[in-house]
Amino acid sequence: MDEEEHKDHQEEEDPHHFAFSDNYSEAVLGGEISATVFDVTGKVVHVAHKMTKYEFLLEHGLYPRDLRNIDPSPVSIIPSILARGRKGAGRCILVNLLHIKALILHDKVLIFDTHSKNKSDTHRLGMFLYELENKLKPTINPEKMHTDMTVLPFELRVLEAILVNVMTTLDGELQVHLKTLNEILVGLEDHVDREQLKELLIGNKNVSRFYQKAVLIRDVLEELLESDDDLQQLYLGTHPKEGLAEVELLIESYCKQADEIVQQASNVRSHIRSTEEIVNIIVDANRNALMLLELKVTIVTVGFAVGAFVAALYGMNLENFIEETNEGMVLVVGVACLGGLLVTWFNLTKLHKTQKIAMFSNAATHTASKPYMLQWIIGLLRRKRTKSRFDNIDMSRPKMKGKKSNILHQLTKMTGKRR
């Protein structure tokens, strides 16, 4: 019984015991990883320092699942900031943000080589290494560094340098997307071009990917702010007397920057959606205009066909009384033209009625769709009919005397309004 308790106690105290108890062999974790190592003063200790994954896990007390956050694979991994290891000198912070994959310890930091095929990411990583070296150099006397309350701990200074580089990268990408999309949107305001629509589609896809990337980074920072335990674990050394205010202000400031970038990207996407809707409306209107023109041409063609039909009947080699008269030619031409014009006028009138959108009652729609001359004739007939009925009223009764002129005046005003 004592041996089992001693064995359990040894597993808790030994951070390297997990590697043997989980049956992970060097053959399984034999791949190599390379990293650039900086010490607490910003001095480069190792450049492209290579080590096997197995040795790396044993040295830092990590689990194989933690390799996913720093594995230099081309597969995009969700951004993360995780505290790992046991209390004391074995504590570390795993950071995976965009092109930066780092392991932060209390006295050094490892920046892993991503070996990305994207040249821009490789260039950004090289610039970050140069910036990190300058930011970690002590600007005050190292002997007084631990007594100066304005200086952040080493792990927080490294984390801040990473966040500064990430926010700068996001802001730079956003400005590129804004410049490209604004040029396309301004061009679409003048005229709708097929090539510009294709460029707008590509730009919309790019800004959507950027928006998703920025949202993930903002969510990581918000999760840190919501958990006091996670914020406390970011201190790898001694905890300050003022509590978590220092690290909380640090994470909160960059969380706000990430949120601003997300909002700007969201506004751009909304602008693109509005432009797409307007373009669709314009395209639909042009399509409807072309269809209307086609219908008008078809109607005119039908009118000519009616006239041609009459001419074809007259041109048949059959005897009839028309050919013996002098007015036959004029009569046939007149009938053909009149028939074609009537058919064309009737079909165009029907097409005009179809274009009307009923906003009120059917009676109002039918009245509005009638030609002005026809409305005037109908109003005149109604007025005469009403006046004839009024003339037939028996005016011999005393009550009706003297009121005929007033009633007639009112009816005249009503019929005038009706017209």
Curated annotation (Swiss-Prot):
Keyword rRNA processing on entry: no
Membrane-protein topology: Multi-pass membrane protein
Keywords: Ion transport, Magnesium, Membrane, Mitochondrion, Mitochondrion inner membrane, Transit peptide, Transmembrane, Transmembrane helix, Transport
Motif (YGMN): 314-317
Compartment(s) where it occurs, according to its Swiss-Prot or TrEMBL record: Mitochondrion inner membrane
Listed InterPro entries: MRS2-like
Membrane-crossing segments per the record: 297-317, 328-348
Pfam families documented for this protein: MRS2-like
UniProt-listed GO biological process terms: mitochondrial magnesium ion transmembrane transport
CDD domains, per database record: Mrs2_Mfm1p-like
Keyword Transport part of the UniProt annotation: yes
Main localization category: mitochondrion
GO cellular component terms, A-Z: mitochondrial inner membrane
UniProt-recorded Gene Ontology molecular function terms: cardiolipin binding; magnesium ion transmembrane transporter activity
UniProt family annotation: Belongs to the CorA metal ion transporter (MIT) (TC 1.A.35) family.
Quaternary data: Homopentamer. Forms homooligomers. Interacts with MFM1.
PANTHER family tied to this protein: MAGNESIUM TRANSPORTER MRS2, MITOCHONDRIAL, RNA SPLICING PROTEIN MRS2, MITOCHONDRIAL
Protein purpose: High-conductance magnesium-selective channel that mediates the influx of magnesium into the mitochondrial matrix. Essential for the splicing of mRNA group II introns in mitochondria by affecting mitochondrial magnesium concentrations, which are critical for group II intron splicing. It also suppresses a variety of mitochondrial intron mutations and its absence may disturb the assembly of mitochondrial membrane complexes.
Name of the protein this chain belongs to: Mitochondrial inner membrane magnesium transporter MRS2
Species: Yarrowia lipolytica (strain CLIB 122 / E 150) (Yeast)
Gene this chain is encoded by: MRS2
